[in-house]
């Protein structure tokens, strides 16, 4: 049989799609597959961002040999971005870790020793010794974990269960604290429930798109392709893009707005004022479904209590608010006039009016998208609340083509970090550790003694750094992230604690990252389809995949590491006598026994797996671990607006958007006819709030924690580029992606470069009050900062831009502001 290249590719795609869907394969496609020595195809969500694209993975002889966009995936419809097309190569970097490595000298652990290969038993021996010593000397507050929005659903659930119920420590937090915490608190304050009410299907039905601090063209390129298609197919569709510098998303914008850093708060209040002044309030919606509250102000910047800015704040960390009347709210936003807004933001008046008109026009369906520009902000929660105000004033919410939409940056920042309760203050399904009723629900469901879960909120990400430095946190397990490179203020607040001889730091990772090389023990980790997994994307879509290949060498999944390490602790070693007295039958049992081998978790047999299906963890334990953990976790949300489908349904589908009730997913929450929790005749119901009403908040402009001055005369903003994902620990090991963008550069306005005698390609030292880094001047290209601002990506381990950043956070969400600090430049 002869086939052209075109026919070959087409037949191959058909074979892949059919195999993954469990369908019969046409004869010509079967022949092609046969010629390829039976490549096996299966579905998986992409390993990278929070979009949640579906891919088809081709494996042969124990390796991934091909990958392509899944034509049946509703998110991406067969398309991949540049990173997605190179997914197989992230698995096969030359420096992939294959065995545990401990710092040793003269055959013993030594903080200053060289990394030496050891066995898993030896690794767990050292970890056990360190954990038990700290627990005995200082108690649960001396241990901690920093996890990930890249954990699978059951990995995050197992980690939260092990720390909060097993070790009785709430000192567990995910790296989603650095990217999505402000979105979470914003959702909770306004709606009483986390995560977006809309979905990606809004794109094809919207009349206008407004991007707030979001470069979707590079950070969510597949969604951007759908927006581009919508914009170019209808001349009446509008796109507005707001940022502190021009980037690739501006190329499509009808209204591209560059504003002074932090002044987005002013623009948001101006639009609310415009809506009111032009009688554009949806009075019927507003009167039935909205409450008004005035927020507490002057809340500080999440810095150490001894910092002058914290000392000066009148209400540091306060999230209090009080009811207010409409007239009071009207008077509050009336201060944000067009003239004042233009002056404070640097945005021309006509551009501001054009933007406000999109929201005010009752005939325009508007979607607001935002990512890190909003969230990584010392008033990120306020920014989230203020954009909700615009949609609540106009009623443009919870309907096809209308709504506010917080985009996530990690593949399971929603499905894992947020939903299963891996934040230091959270429990599954939006429950929190400070609520006695919520703790009781968890303790009863987990069949552990009452009072096991601590009521005190644990250490969040930045607080963990500070506690390590201060010697209060002494054993620290970092999983599935590279926080030494990604977190703020490396020199002053992170590195000192990691290298403090009082502390022991473990890093679980597939590669020797900056974090791994700063640790004391490195555990080699299985990644992506080397394990069975589940992610939850930005539109509430939960997606499963099967294990498709084995991990190299002795690399083990995060789930295996957590569950097996739990065997090292008996209940009497971690729980006080008063707890054991409640359930004496738990004496002598290990944390593995009481958390992971319970009847509820272990009841699903291996026969639920196909005979030839890989699943290393379950086959080692003798029961279907992932299914047991998922079903135990899913119980928390069922009947409470977070309903997940039965486990097996997800392996058959291309993901389902919760709540899933009676087998049907939900596209638009809170509205009648779309959401099963909204009854006939209710219209809208924001059922996260006791009265079913959302909240409009009155919140003012407050300045950034640090701004340029005479000495440090430039704003610095950090972020990503299309070719690399986060710290580049995966993408920089893909030769094609590395060649496309080999090193970080400093994007700067040509006039700012000229006044400093700098030219494109020159080496330049970037200096802040905390550190310095040498980069390369770039006056052209994709990012075009205004005068007074420079932009630098953080993917390059040789240019640690977070040596420069300030560890100021939003005081409510504890999320770091990576977008605003002051720097100066010196020619090298």
UniProtKB/Swiss-Prot annotation:
InterPro entries (alphabetical): Asp_de-COase-like_dom_sf, CT_Nitrate-R-NapA-like, MoPterin_dinucl-bd_dom, Mopterin_OxRdtase, Mopterin_OxRdtase_4Fe-4S_dom, MopterinOxRdtase_cofactor_BS, Periplasm_NO3_reductase_lsu, Prok_molybdopt-oxidoreductase
GO terms for cellular component: membrane; nitrate reductase complex; periplasmic space
One Pfam family named in its UniProt record: Molybdopterin
Binding locations of Mo-bis(molybdopterin guanine dinucleotide): 83, 150, 175, 179, 212-219, 243-247, 262-264, 372, 376, 482, 508-509, 531, 558, 718-727, 802, 819
Ranges for domain 4Fe-4S Mo/W bis-MGD-type: 39-95
GO molecular function, one term: electron transfer activity
Catalytic function, reaction form: 2 Fe(II)-[cytochrome] + nitrate + 2 H(+) = 2 Fe(III)-[cytochrome] + nitrite + H2O
Cofactor binding comment, as recorded: Binds 1 [4Fe-4S] cluster.
Binding residue positions for substrate: 794
SUPFAM superfamilies according to UniProt: ADC-like, Formate dehydrogenase/DMSO reductase, domains 1-3
The organism's place on the tree of life at top rank: Bacteria
PROSITE patterns assigned to the protein according to its UniProt record, in alphabetical order: 4FE4S_MOW_BIS_MGD, MOLYBDOPTERIN_PROK_1, TAT
Main location: periplasm
The protein's enzyme class: oxidoreductase
Stated family: Belongs to the prokaryotic molybdopterin-containing oxidoreductase family. NasA/NapA/NarB subfamily.
Subunit structure: Component of the periplasmic nitrate reductase NapAB complex composed of NapA and NapB.
PANTHER family in UniProt: PERIPLASMIC NITRATE REDUCTASE (PTHR43105:SF11), RESPIRATORY NITRATE REDUCTASE (PTHR43105)
Full protein name: Periplasmic nitrate reductase
The species this protein was found in: Citrobacter koseri (strain ATCC BAA-895 / CDC 4225-83 / SGSC4696)
């Amino acid at each position: 049989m002869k086939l052209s290249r075109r026919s070959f590719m087409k037949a191959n795609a058909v074979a892949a799609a059919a195999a993954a869907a469990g369908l019969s394969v046409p004869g010509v496609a079967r022949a092609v597959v046969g010629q390829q020595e039976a490549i096996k195809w299966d579905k998986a969500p992409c390993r990278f961002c929070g979009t949640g694209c579906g891919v088809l993975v081709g494996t042969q002889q124990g390796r991934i040999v091909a990958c392509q966009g899944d034509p049946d995936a509703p998110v991406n419809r067969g398309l991949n971005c540049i990173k997605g097309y190179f997914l197989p190569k992230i698995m096969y970097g030359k420096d992939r870790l294959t065995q545990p490595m401990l710092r040793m000298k003269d055959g013993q652990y030594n903080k200053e020793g060289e990394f030496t290969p050891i066995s898993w038993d030896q690794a767990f021996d050292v970890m056990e010794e360190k954990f038990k010593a700290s627990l005995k000397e200082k108690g649960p507050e001396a241990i901690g974990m920093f996890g990930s929005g890249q954990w699978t659903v059951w990995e995050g659930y197992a980690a939260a269960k092990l720390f909060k119920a097993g070790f009785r420590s709430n000192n567990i937090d995910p790296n989603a604290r650095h990217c999505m915490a402000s979105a979470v608190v914003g959702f909770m304050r306004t709606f009483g429930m986390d995560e977006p009410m809309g979905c990606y299907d809004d794109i094809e039905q919207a009349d206008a798109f407004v991007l707030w601090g979001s470069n979707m063209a590079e950070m969510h390129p597949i969604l951007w392709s759908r927006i581009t298609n919508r914009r170019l197919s209808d001349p009446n569709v509008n796109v507005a893009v707001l940022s502190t510098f021009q980037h690739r998303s501006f190329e499509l914008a009808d209204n591209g707005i560059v504003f002074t850093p932090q002044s987005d708060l002013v623009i948001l209040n101006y639009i609310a004022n415009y809506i009111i002044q032009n009688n554009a309030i949806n009075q019927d919606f507003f009167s039935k479904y909205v409450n008004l509250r005035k927020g507490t102000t002057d809340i500080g910047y999440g810095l150490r209590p001894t910092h002058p800015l914290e000392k000066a704040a009148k209400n540091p960390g306060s999230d209090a608010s009080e009811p207010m009347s409409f007239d009071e709210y009207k008077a509050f936003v009336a201060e944000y006039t067009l003239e004042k807004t233009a002056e404070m933001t640097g945005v021309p008046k006509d551009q501001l009016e054009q933007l406000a008109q999109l929201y005010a026009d009752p005939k325009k369906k508007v979607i607001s998208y935002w990512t890190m520009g909003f969230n990584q902000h010392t008033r990120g929660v306020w920014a989230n609340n203020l954009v909700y105000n615009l949609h609540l004033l106009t009623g443009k919410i919870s309907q096809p083509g209308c709504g506010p939409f917080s985009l996530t940056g990690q593949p399971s920042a929603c499905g894992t970090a947020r939903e299963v309760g891996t934040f230091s203050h959270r429990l599954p399904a939006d429950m929190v550790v400070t609520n006695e009723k919520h703790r009781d629900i968890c303790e009863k469901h987990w069949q552990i003694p009452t009072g096991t879960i601590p009521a005190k909120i644990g250490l969040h990400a930045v607080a963990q750094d500070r506690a390590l430095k201060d010697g209060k946190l002494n054993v620290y397990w970092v999983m599935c992230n590279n926080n030494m490179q990604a977190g703020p203020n490396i020199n002053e607040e992170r590195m000192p604690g990691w290298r403090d001889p009082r502390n022991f730091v473990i890093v679980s990772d597939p590669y020797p990252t900056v974090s791994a090389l700063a640790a004391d023990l490195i555990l080699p980790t299985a990644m992506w389809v080397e394990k069975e997994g589940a992610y939850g994307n930005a539109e509430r879509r939960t997606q499963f995949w099967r294990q498709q290949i084995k991990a190299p060498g002795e690399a083990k999944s995060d789930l295996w590491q957590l569950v097996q390490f739990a065997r090292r602790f008996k209940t009497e070693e971690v729980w006080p006598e008063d707890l054991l007295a409640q359930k004496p039958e738990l004496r002598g049992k290990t944390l593995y026994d009481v958390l992971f081998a319970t009847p509820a978790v272990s009841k699903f047999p291996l026969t639920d797996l196909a005979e030839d299906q890989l699943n290393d963890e379950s086959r080692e334990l003798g029961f279907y671990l992932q299914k047991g953990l998922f079903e135990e976790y899913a119980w928390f949300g069922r009947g409470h607006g977070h309903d997940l489908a039965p486990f097996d349904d997800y392996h058959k589908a291309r993901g389902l958007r919760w709540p899933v009730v009676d087998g049907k997913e939900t596209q638009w929450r809170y509205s009648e006819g779309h959401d099963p929790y909204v009854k006939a005749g209710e219209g809208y119901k924001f059922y996260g709030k006791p009265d079913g009403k959302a909240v409009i908040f009155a919140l003012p402009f407050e300045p950034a924690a640090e701004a340029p001055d005479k000495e440090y005369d430039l704003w610095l903003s950090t972020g990503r580029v299309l070719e690399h994902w986060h710290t580049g620990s995966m993408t920089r090991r893909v030769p094609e992606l590395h060649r496309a963008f080999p090193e970080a550069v400093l994007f700067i306005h040509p006039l700012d470069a000229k006044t400093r005698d700098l030219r494109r390609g020159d080496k330049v030292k970037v200096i802040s009050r905390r550190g310095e880094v040498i980069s390369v001047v770039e006056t052209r290209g994709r990012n075009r900062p205004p005068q007074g601002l420079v932009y630098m990506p953080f993917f390059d381990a040789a240019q640690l831009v977070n040596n420069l950043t300030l560890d100021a956070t939003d005081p409510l969400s504890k999320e770091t502001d990576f977008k605003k600090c002051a720097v100066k430049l010196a020619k090298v």
